[in-house]
């Protein structure tokens, strides 16, 4: 089964090669998200990544659209995708990264790391009187 896949995701060469090797019978085009062309979207049977809605709307034969965000709401509006198009998204893909970031920010605030960072950037090595802050 031959499918044409447009990939609008920031992939490195190794990831591109792995994707192509996983389904050698598929034909791939790789575009940066800021360099997606209507002709590529119209060519594709499958779109991986958030190509512009205005371009997606023109393709009446897309079989699968994979959003690289958790909320593909703009693509779910009537008339954007064909009725039989499968839509998947990245729900849950960022959970660990977001929770790690939240923990890091909380620790930074609790330990006044941002105050120390600002002082260090200003080359001020005097202690900070934290009793005035807390």
Predicted features by range, described:
Residues 83-133:
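Phosphate-binding beta-alpha-beta segment of Rossmann-like dinucleotide-binding domains, i.e.
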Residues 65, 133-134:
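Single conserved hydrophobic/aromatic residue that forms the stacking wall/gate
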Residues 16, 29, 57, 117-119, ...:
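Arginine residue identity/basic-tract feature
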Residues 1-88:
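An N-terminal-biased, well-structured beta-alpha scaffold segment characteristic
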């Amino acid at each position: 089964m031959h499918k044409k896949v447009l990939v609008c995701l920031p992939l490195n060469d190794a990831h591109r090669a792995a994707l192509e090797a996983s389904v050698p019978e598929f034909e791939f085009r790789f575009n940066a998200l800021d360099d997606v062309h209507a002709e590529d979207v119209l060519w594709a049977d499958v779109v991986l990544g958030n190509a512009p809605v205005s371009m997606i709307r023109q393709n009446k034969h897309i079989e699968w659209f994979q959003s690289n965000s958790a909320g593909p709401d703009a693509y779910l509006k009537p008339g954007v995708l064909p009725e039989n198009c499968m839509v998947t998204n990245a729900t849950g893909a960022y959970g660990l990264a977001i929770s790690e970031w939240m923990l890091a920010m909380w620790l930074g605030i609790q330990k006044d790391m941002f105050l120390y960072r600002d002082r260090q950037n200003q080359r001020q090595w005097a202690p900070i009187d934290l009793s005035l802050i807390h």
